[in-house]
Amino acid sequence: MESVDQSCSVPPGFRFHPTDEELVGYYLRKKVASQKIDLDVIRDIDLYRIEPWDLQESCRIGYEERNEWYFFSHKDKKYPTGTRTNRATMAGFWKATGRDKAVYDKSKLIGMRKTLVFYKGRAPNGQKTDWIMHEYRLESDENAPPQEEGWVVCRAFKKKPMTGQAKNTETWSSSYFYDELPSGVRSVTEPLNYVSKQKQNVFAQDLMFKQELEGSDIGLNFIHCDQFIQLPQLESPSLPLTKRPVSLTSITSLEKNKNIYKRHLIEEDVSFNALISSGNKDKKKKKTSVMTTDWRALDKFVASQLMSQEDGVSGFGGHHEEDNNKIGHYNNEESNNKGSVETASSTLLSDREEENRFISGLLCSNLDYDLYRDLHV
């Protein structure tokens, strides 16, 4: 077979992964202009006489297994007087889906790309398959009507089957998703996608390994040692953190503890206020006692003065000795009264010192109480 013979012409390790710009700007443009292609690896295929599952042998490049195949095809009209393209085969037909996408070379429009899906049977009762094809045509005006005749270059591939959880979402093959991106970005995203997939696989294996270790009873004695139990548990970034369920009993216990703490603070406030009020009462009592002692001393002094005056009036003209005795007695009384006043003033000073010490003690206890409240709130 000619295609099989030509497949051996490429050197070992040859890979053919052209971009959209390369397919349209180089291969298709040279094909339409009948110019020689340096390495002619794209076959001419009559798309209407071959089934998609036969493209693997007809479009083989070298001996490497491939998941996408390239070929040139010439479009023909379905009807001689119509405008529709004939895309029917013996087993089914190719149906266009979605809108055509523009292919740019830098900022210049060079072509359009159409996406088609292969259906088995005949319309409208065809059965959809996993075969996808991208059809490229030359175009210089994006709004121009599509050309229904002429050469096109095609890329055909099969969508990967969905397995497991992937059945919930429709997953296209890597080549299909790769071609949906802008052609200038594909060369950058391909290695990044590979690296991200490798990281995801390593993460999944690590997670499964850790879960198996946690589920199995290893029986290591050093894990159950007290010194290891007292250590804080380290959080692993690779494992998802699970939230502990909060029960109603835990919530009620927290509320009870909160109420008890509030009552404790209120009792402390009441006791502190009572202490301050009792201190004020003691101060008042001391002041009243000092004042009473002072007034008693003054009363004695005044009474002695009055008595001395009465004695002087009644005994005026008496003996000189009695006057001297009265004067001495008066002097003694006066000295006694002075001593009582001095003692009263000394008691006042001592009371003021005690009051200052009491106030300073209260201030210190108040500061300690505020610190205690700040630490326990």
UniProtKB/Swiss-Prot annotation:
**Segments for region (Disordered):** 312-347
Q: Where in or outside the cell is it found? A: Nucleus
State where composition is biased (Polar residues).
337-347
Q: Name one Pfam family in it.
A: NAM
Q: Where is the composition biased (Basic and acidic residues)?
A: 318-336
Where is the NAC domain positioned along the sequence?
10-159
Q: Which residues bind DNA?
A: 110-165
Q: Which InterPro entries match?
A: NAC-dom (IPR003441), NAC_dom_sf (IPR036093)
Q: Which SUPFAM superfamilies match?
A: NAC domain
* Primary subcellular site in the record, as a coarse category: nucleus
Q: What GO molecular function terms would the record report?
A: DNA-binding transcription factor activity; sequence-specific DNA binding; transcription cis-regulatory region binding
Q: Identify one Gene Ontology CC term for this UniProt entry.
A: nucleus
Q: Which UniProt keywords apply?
A: Activator, Cell wall biogenesis/degradation, Developmental protein, DNA-binding, Nucleus, Transcription, Transcription regulation
In which tissues has expression of this protein been reported?
Answer: Detected in root protoxylem and metaxylem poles and in vessels of protoxylems, outermost metaxylems, inner metaxylems, shoots and hypocotyls. Expressed in roots, hypocotyls, cotyledons and leaves. Present in developing xylems. Specifically expressed in vessels but not in interfascicular fibers in stems.
A Gene Ontology annotation in the biological process aspect, one of them, is:
xylem vessel member cell differentiation
The record describes the protein's role as: Transcription activator that binds to the secondary wall NAC binding element (SNBE), 5'-(T/A)NN(C/T)(T/C/G)TNNNNNNNA(A/C)GN(A/C/T)(A/T)-3', in the promoter of target genes. Involved in xylem formation by promoting the expression of secondary wall-associated transcription factors and of genes involved in secondary wall biosynthesis and programmed cell death, genes driven by the secondary wall NAC binding element (SNBE). Triggers thickening of secondary walls.
Q: What is known of its domains?
A: The NAC domain includes a DNA binding domain and a dimerization domain.
Which family does the record claim for this protein? Answer: Belongs to the plant vascular related NAC-domain protein family.
How is the subunit organization of this protein annotated in UniProt? Interacts with NAC030/VND7.
- Provide the protein name: NAC domain-containing protein 76
Q: Which organism is it from?
A: Arabidopsis thaliana (Mouse-ear cress)
Gene name of the encoded protein: NAC076
